[in-house]
Amino acid sequence: PQSGTALDENVKEEIRAFKMDQSKVKVPWMLLEIVQNDDRIDVVKVTKKAGPSDNLETLREELKQREVVYFVLDYEPSEEKRAKHNIPKGKTYPLTCFWSMETANIKLKMKYSSTVGTLKSATSTLKTYLEAHDFDDLSEEAIGDKIKNF
């Protein structure tokens, strides 16, 4: 029997493409969830990608519908933060996040948290990792604290 949860064969390529093509949407993001593949084995798979009209608000709406999920986000600081820290307009910070509501099912939390290492290795080029349990953890201040040189 397989221990842990593997990545779907396309995840690394989809993350690489996400990092390379960040021009199509203002705040691009992707959701990654643990699902069963055709062989009935649990795998981490991209289940939703941001579209042209999506933004941080639509990501929040998606998160409200899920107790536990991973996502990658290309975060762009607000105009105020850019001015304060002399960050050029258009500069973004790709990050990986483990979203786990405080009220989430404990078995589901454990299933996802046991796979964090595998996901981190696949998203290592995104550098910043964030764990969030409520929307305060996804505030600009909280994200800024996690991003180096911010």
Curated annotation (Swiss-Prot):
InterPro entries listed in its UniProt record: ADF-H, ADF-H/Gelsolin-like_dom_sf
Pfam family, one: Cofilin_ADF
Positions of the ADF-H domain: 3-148
Keywords tagged on the record: Actin-binding, Repeat
SMART domains: ADF (SM00102)
Superkingdom assignment: Eukaryota
GO molecular function: actin binding
Entry function: Depactin interacts with actin at some of its 12 N-terminal residues and 20 C-terminal residues. Binds to actin monomers from filaments and in solution.
Record-stated family: Belongs to the actin-binding proteins ADF family.
Protein name (database record): Depactin
Organism: Asterias amurensis
